[in-house]
């Protein structure tokens, strides 16, 4: 089909040129003697002017048309359009295909509910803002390919149908028709295979990898997602981080023309938790946590005295705007973090006010005001618990909430940092069992590895997360390459020898044949695209995403299957 160029390729320099364009009718305005058509293609919109002496068929919104005509200068330019200085004086308009009235407005400013947008995703994708996000995604992938290829990485595809192994989240499983009663699992990550590639001697691997996790969804999660997955041999942590900073610098420059300053900051996990209440802190604003244990333990409030940890944050200038209802809502939020006590104090006339203020003597009140650098009309929130992480994460959630509500985050800014030196394990407060903070293949730090047998809770991990604007945009670690240490980790996690053999036998066996020191990282492609596109909804940057119920309104997946298929698989559904 004849086409001279895309709309956005035309400019004031093309005046007088005869062109043939293809696209959709975005909007039409009939003024009697003149018909104006906004023609939209993947590059943008251009105005087509049809004079009354040019006879064309009836056209309506979203009709697919071909336009032939001459580029002309517009009498009144439109600065909002890239092609706003020019128009096409049509000599011929051909209707290629008609369209029904669409169930949503095909425009950047649509009023459609998200489920409607997802049901008619093929229409939603016509909106320029959606196409822009997919182009951003493609640019990130292209930049990653160019950088990693230039640094001698080899792109390798790993299996999608694999063995179910405990990696943290629940697996999506696929029944085998040939092996009745047996199931494949879709990979939560290519973790084991990329380590096996290192044992196989490839030394530098990468993949744009599809991953699947059956976990609770939120705005920045999907059940099926994409990673820029990377593994390398014979590099230490500093070398890997330096190499990956180069990749990030190229991505930011190529995609949004933003220069990031290297080297990036490195924040230890303990400092991130204690200062910001998060293992993925957004440091574009203050509201830092302060340790007030030594002050509040001297008050007459009994719950302070029975708690090992107390921290506080100051929210500036909102005391008068904070009602009893607001405080009750904060109390409900605090319950999610199992805090022993949670109090809200207002600063008025250089004194504390609130239901808990009576427990503070003058000395404790003055010490609190001084430590927190609190001023009149500020709000002081204090949380206490015998769990430091509960206190920090609870206040960290409120820190982020108030930063958004008070507009403390500067738009169009990027805050990149590494969080390093994580604990290797986390301990369940109810069962007392250990689970890996990252995954069970993470190497302990050399200085704490000797504690594995005696004090696993104090073993640190050679792990690192890249945090951008408060989002974990990627994470990785040095890997265990010693068979004995890997078995020890599995045993600490409560796996029996039979479990280890059945689920990881092939992996452990590979360690017998000369495993190199190795490590890697995976960047969340969806999350990176979300950040660079300036949206907070991961579904906006995926062509065909699932909704918050892990369903696809367009295809109605997941769905029931025919009984004949179930019989082939040897499966019976019990209602």
Protein language model regions, located:
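Class II aminoacyl-tRNA synthetase catalytic cores and aaRS-like
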Residues: 1-575
């Amino acid at each position: 089909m004849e086409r001279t160029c895309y709309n956005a390729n035309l400019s004031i320099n093309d005046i007088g040129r005869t062109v043939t364009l293809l696209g959709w009718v975005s909007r039409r305005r009939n003024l009697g003697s003149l018909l104006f058509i906004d023609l939209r293609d993947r590059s943008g919109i251009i105005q087509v002017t049809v004079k009354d002496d040019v006879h064309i068929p009836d056209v309506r919104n979203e009709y697919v048309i071909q336009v032939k005509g001459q580029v002309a200068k517009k009498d009144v330019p439109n600065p909002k359009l890239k092609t706003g200085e020019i128009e096409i004086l049509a000599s011929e308009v051909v209707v290629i295909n008609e369209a029904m009235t669409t169930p949503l407005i095909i425009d950047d400013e649509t009023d459609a509910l998200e489920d409607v947008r997802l049901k008619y995703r093929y229409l939603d994708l016509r909106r320029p803002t959606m196409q822009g996000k997919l182009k951003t995604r493609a640019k990130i992938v292209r930049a990653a390919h160019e950088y990693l290829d230039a640094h001698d990485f080899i792109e390798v595809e790993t299996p999608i149908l694999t063995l179910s192994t405990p990696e943290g989240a629940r697996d999506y499983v696929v029944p085998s028709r040939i092996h009745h009663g047996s199931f494949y699992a879709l990979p939560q990550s290519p973790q084991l295979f990329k380590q096996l590639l290192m044992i196989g001697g490839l030394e530098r691997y990468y993949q744009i990898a599809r991953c699947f996790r059956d976990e609770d969804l939120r705005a920045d999660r999907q059940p099926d997602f994409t990673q820029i997955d990377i593994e390398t041999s014979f590099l230490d942590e500093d070398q890997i981080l330096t190499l990956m900073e180069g990749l990030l610098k190229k991505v930011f420059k190529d995609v949004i023309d933003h220069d990031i300053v290297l080297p990036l900051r490195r924040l230890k996990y303990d400092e991130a938790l204690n200062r910001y209440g998060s293992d993925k802190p957004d440091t574009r604003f203050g509201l830092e946590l302060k340790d007030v244990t030594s002050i509040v333990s001297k008050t007459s409030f009994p719950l302070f005295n029975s708690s090992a940890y107390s921290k506080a944050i100051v929210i500036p200038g909102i005391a008068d705007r904070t009602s009893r209802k607001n405080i009750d809502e904060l109390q409900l939020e605090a319950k999610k973090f199992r805090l022993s006590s949670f109090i809200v104090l207002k600063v008025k006339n250089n004194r504390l006010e609130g239901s808990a203020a009576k427990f503070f003597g003058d000395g404790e009140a003055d010490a609190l005001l001084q430590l927190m650098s609190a001023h009149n009309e500020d709000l002081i929130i204090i949380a206490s618990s015998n769990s430091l992480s509960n206190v920090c994460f609870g206040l960290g959630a409120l820190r982020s909430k108030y930063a958004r509500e008070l507009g403390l985050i500067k738009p169009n800014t990027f805050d990149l940092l590494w969080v390093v030196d994580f604990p290797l394990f986390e301990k369940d407060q109810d069962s007392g069992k250990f689970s890996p903070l990252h995954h069970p293949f993470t190497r302990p730090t050399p200085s704490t590895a000797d504690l594995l047998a005696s004090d696993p809770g104090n073993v640190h991990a050679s792990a690192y997360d890249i945090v951008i604007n408060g989002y974990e945009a990627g994470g990785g670690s040095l890997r265990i390459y010693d068979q004995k240490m890997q078995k020890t980790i599995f045993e600490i996690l409560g796996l029996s020898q039979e479990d280890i053999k059945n689920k990881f036998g092939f992996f452990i066996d590979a360690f017998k044949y000369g495993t190199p020191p190795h490590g890697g990282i995976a960047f969340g492609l969806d999350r990176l695209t979300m950040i660079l596109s300036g949206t907070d909804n991961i579904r906006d940057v995926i062509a065909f995403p699932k909704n918050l119920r892990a369903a696809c309104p367009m295809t109605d997946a997941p769905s029931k299957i025919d009984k004949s298929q179930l019989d082939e698989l040897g499966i019976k559904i019990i209602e």
